Amino acid sequence: MRLAEFVTSASVAAIVTDPRLPDNPIVECNDRFLELTGYSREEVIGRNCRFLVGPGTDPARRKMLRDAIEAQRPVIVELLNYRKDGTPFLNSVMIAPIFDSEDSLVGFVGSQLEVSTEE
């Protein structure tokens, strides 16, 4: 199974970014990501995930994501993100690096899962 097929068939919101391009933009996303965020595919592809950040997003948690990306290591972080309509949602974000056969970084795969705040 190719990575793009995996992402599009994943049961959770998922994206692929390309760190070889300026600003590590999203190059693939699935329908669940679009449903979760309220954006269209055209609004997502080519952008860095920062468009989901808003006033309540914790800078320390964002730094955890940035540090893991810079170190090319997997990470899971819960943070407050924002949908296109401005509504916040608690998001469990998993990011993992993708390496080619020569161990060169070629991308990151990310999954997003809305975390319920109800007890």
Describe the role of every protein-language-model region.
Residues 17, 96-98, 113:
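Output-coupling edge of small sensory domains
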Residues 33-44:
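PAS/PAS-like sensory domain cap-loop motif
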Residues 45-56:
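PAS-family sensory/regulatory domains
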Residues 68-73:
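Soluble sensory domains of the PAS superfamily and closely related sensory modules
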Residues 1-31:
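Sensory modules in modular signal-transduction proteins
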Residues 19-20, 80-86, 99-101, 104-118:
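PAS-family sensory domains
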Residues 12, 75-77, 84, 89-93, ...:
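PAS and PAS-like sensory/regulatory domains
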